[in-house]
Amino acid sequence: MGLQDRTPTTVEEYASYKTRFSNWGRWGEDDQLGTLNHITDDQIKYAAGLINEGLSVSCANPIATEQVVGNQQRNPRPADHRMMVGADSSGDYVGVAFHGYVNTHIDALCHIFTGDSSMGGRLYNDRDPNLVTDAGALTNSVDYWKDGIVTRGVLYDIPAMRSQEYVSPDEPIEGWHLEDWAESVGIQPRPGDAVLVRSGCDAFWRANENFEFSHPPATPGNGPSVIEYLYDNDASLLGWDLQEAGYKHFDYPARIPIHEVVIPYMGLPLLDNANFDELSLTCKSTGRYEFMLVISPLVIRGGTGSPVNPIALF
């Protein structure tokens, strides 16, 4: 079952993921990078060699300063943007609770625990969750990535593969769909790749304005077997425009099944709520789905993540 025989992950298989795909200790007891360790000097040089058209494409959504009309639960805590306009200058203040389903951000490895900390839950690399304090995280925080994330990005454009505007809610993206897409566009996965999965977020919401939003939402997205693809190919991170699929073939013992494995066990960062629509058009026009990807998290000491503006370079 799972990726190998192209069938949805069972409950038993999902439970095994936490040991099968654990990277605890793989890069030493002091590791703070997780799967970003897969990004070698050679991988960065390879990515740099992909820049020959002189094009740059943002993969971010605008910071959301308002609730969504008629669907307020999609952004229950809008960003606070205040202008300060003087006689000869201007400035502004921005405050944002960036985790959720609207703002483009990267999750640090302190964001998700293996379970309730009062019942033995741990952080990535078997660290004590009490190291995450009200003053900030003392380990696994986003400021360990202050030098930026630079690697080859690969767009997995699943709506394009299915000739759809967006992925159907009852047809989750599975690991073998990523395999099929890569083969169809001539991509050979490389260790350190940023796997960027497009579901067609904007098109979905345009067509489903009154779709009932819950937490987690029942939107289209990715099934747990995607975890197998990431691990087997030594991916450095997963980026997505829509996150876990709301439709699940089985009742997994997890609220957000992919988050709950890849962050605390695998040590893999997640680029949440990206926008890959313009990137999709650029990949189609250039005839290639690989590019240099640059992500520069804010240096937030003890931060659980950061708003980001990922840039794809061709």
Tell where the protein language model's regions lie, with residue ranges.
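Active-/binding-site microenvironments in catalytic and ligand-binding cores
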Residues: M1-F314
